[in-house]
Amino acid sequence: MAGTMHLLTAVSLILMLSSANAESTVYNLLTSPDCLPDLLHGGLAEQGVTELYILTTFRIQPGTGNTIFSLYNPRDNSKYFEFSVFGKANKAILRYLRRDGRMSAVTFNKLNLADGEKHRLLFHLKGLEVGHPGGFPHSQGALPVPGVELHLDCRLVETLRDLPAVFNGLNNHQAVELKTMQGKAQEGLEELKLAYGDSVENVASLQDCHTQSDSVQALGLNTKQLTTQMLELTKVINELKDVLIQQVKETSFLRNTISECQACGLSGAEVVKPKCAPGVCFRDDMCIETAEGVECGPCPDGYTGDGYSCDDVDECQFNPCFPGVRCVNMAPGFRCEACPLGFTGKPLEGVGVAYAQTHKQVCDDIDECKGPDNGGCTANSICVNSVGSYQCGRCKTGFTGDQIRGCKPEKSCGNRLQNPCDPNAQCTEERDGTITCQCGIGWAGNGYLCGKDTDIDGYPDERLRCRDPTCRKDNCVTVPNSGQEDADGDGKGDACDPDADGDGILNEQDNCWLTPNINQQNSDKDSHGDACDNCVRVDNPDQRDTDSDGLGDACDDDMDGDGLKNFLDNCQRVKNRDQLDRDGDGVGDACDSCPDIPNPNQSDIDNDLVGDSCDTNQDSDGDGHQDSKDNCPMVINSSQLDTDKDGIGDECDDDDDNDGIPDSLPPGPDNCRLVPNPEQIDDNNDGVGDICESDFDQDKVIDRIDNCPENAEITLTDFRAYQTVVLDPEGDAQIDPNWVVLNQGMEIVQTMNSDPGLAVGYTAFSGVDFEGTFHVNTVTDDDYAGFIFGYQDSSSFYVVMWKQTEQTYWQATPFRAVAEPGIQLKAVKSKTGPGEHLRNSLWHTGDTNDQVRLLWKDPRNVGWKDKVSYRWYLQHRPQVGYIRVRFYEGTELVADSGVTIDTTMRGGRLGVFCFSQENIIWSNLKYRCNDTIPEDFQEFSTQHGMDPL
């Protein structure tokens, strides 16, 4: 036995040495990228390739980032396989499309690849599916376990137990192209190769990584040991020769002995026949006694074997179940689970191969569009049934509108007058009876003429034949820029102009990308050139300028412009010439978070604009204002509107304008509830007083363009004044967000790959409609972006957030957080507040105790697409807890939460949200005060047994 083992060892060594001399097939993808589609569309499988290598060598400058290479579909810009480096965050991310069609991401932290040095990367992909086996040594025998090994600078750093789908063969209709990093000075991609047909050790040598085979290392072999093994092999063979000679002699002796026994008549001895006994056959009832002995009958249905032993047949391999339905193998038999959502049919059970081959589960599509409710689509709209689902389309011929506002007769507009609007616009009757037209989502113009608006920023792709500003051609057709900023006046908007200031220096390298400065002079080294630096000789990277006088706060001796020098001003960033300070804490009342209680440090740990010294967190009505500061402590009124400034909020004031005419009781109702008019003059007897006929709140903005016609404090959407809230203030996992506000507060851009953070406006709302265009203007990274509403403090708010791919958060403390792709609506009510618990809870898709509740998730599990614009439309009515959010891609409704009821936050402020995602644009932002309860709330209440209003 020992000799046999020596023989096997020597033979295996010879096989290893022979395979180590195999030659690789190597493709240089930098010079021949066109070979890649043929290989991925079946070329590798046809050659029997089961192991594949991708080698790349690159150099990235410190503090920068780049996508090293990416395999993607040029038709829809979707990714198959991508490796990116983030220098500032000191990490790298591998993203890939899984075989189940979902994106996955692996994050490598504390990986300093952006250091100006050359780095070598080797991907070893194993377990590829084979089309015609036998092409290479690796295709012989058992296939390797599918997975990916990542070697960095000749060192194994990660092993994935999954194989990206792109390397298992693409369908012919799935286009694939290669995109490589665009290097700047002092950096670039030096090598990108694809290899197969050899060992990882030999392939690694192409990158000057000289390693021994793992198996050779384990044996500790060298040339001397090989010689010793060969000598031992010769010795063993000689010993085996002697043994065989002896065995031949013994066999001959036995044959002669048997012959002699037969000659003596011993062959007549009675032979005892075996009989059936328990355990002889697979089942006792299968045992048969014959003249020749015992036989076993055939295996029963659902099993295979010789009758003595029978093994269960996996009938599921014959695909008896409806596509998408789970098949459960049993012993014996199989079972198909219920038909998927959108289909109807019976479960299927059976036993045996024949049954599985001749019986297939049948699931019939449910036509949701049949029936009186039109599939749930708005009346008079088109419901399109599809296999397993349905979609709500445009209004039927003769009707106009959309799924939000309903479909009305095309020739009428509320007052039954002829509809003057464009077919792609909505017609609205205002409170004074006038008609306004507004282009629908995905369209832009003046409402009477509408054109296609690809990026949904409010400007048409092509110029329209009308004079309104919104009829002009969009200067960035595919990048939303609702302000149409164009610094160099070349007709190409700053958002899509690679040299926005026209000075010949590209934006990425220009230290004043909106101001021409060929010399790039920078006296203070704060990354802002002198030509655009509001403090030329003082470092101020944030460029903050409170009074907008062109002089940055860092070098302005009167930051708020109130005429008082900073060292004398008790509110340095808030104008207050009176310098009132009731509590004498050195902080003026105008900027004091506790004006009646001394708190010189102005600490506000929960970011609710109320200092910790006077923050009681006692809020009886849940509207975000503590009772001691709430002008209606027992009535929900998050906006705190007090028209007559009498200290009583309008929501609980019987006479809002204090003109002596009650709002609703006799001798009212007041025909101008917000404007004093004791005479109640109404010449046209339309029920609206003359003084407020077209401007109900008398804020000098007519109602039809007023975002809040019943609130004189709010007229237009404006986020220029905002509060920044950092949700993970501790640690150095990432950096804080960088917010840039454009278009007079109606557009926000976040530029950094950052920790979770919020930019929150200071205006609080009760009922509100909030809409905007969401766009990720990069192909780098795949994380969270969204918006918030009902913000009351840094532990209490609603967030709508969208993740592109599935990913486990790279910080496993305090718990493992897994993000799934798709849109999520969450209610945040955190007991800990900003920190690692809230951070991981926001990342995680699902509920987390005492932190976050998932109210709704888009069942499609679809991530956002790179450089694609989406329009959201939110309705929030905190008085009844009504929430509904819709998302559009172009003109198509792609996600709808439906009616969601939650009363955790009874109103609050609005803002935007980001988490580890850079280059996010929130464009064409609009908010409108609206306390009207939508019609679908009544339907929802009836169906769910709630108390109607």
Swiss-Prot record:
The gene is thbs4b. It comes from Danio rerio. Residues 578-671 are annotated as: Disordered. This is Thrombospondin-4-B. Residues 720-934 form the TSP C-terminal domain. InterPro entries: ConA-like_dom_sf (IPR013320), EGF-like_Ca-bd_dom (IPR001881), EGF-like_dom (IPR000742), EGF_Ca-bd_CS (IPR018097), NOTCH1_EGF-like (IPR049883), Thrombospondin_3-like_rpt (IPR003367), Thrombospondin_3_rpt (IPR017897), Thrombospondin_C (IPR008859). It comes from the Eukaryota. Homotrimer; disulfide-linked. Its main location: endoplasmic reticulum. One of its GO terms (biological process) is tendon development. PANTHER family: THROMBOSPONDIN, THROMBOSPONDIN-4. GO terms for molecular function: calcium ion binding; growth factor activity; heparin binding. One of its GO terms (cellular component) is extracellular space. Residues 649-660 have a biased composition (Acidic residues). Residues 312-349, 365-408, 409-451 form the EGF-like domain. SMART domains: EGF (SM00181), EGF_CA (SM00179), TSPN (SM00210).
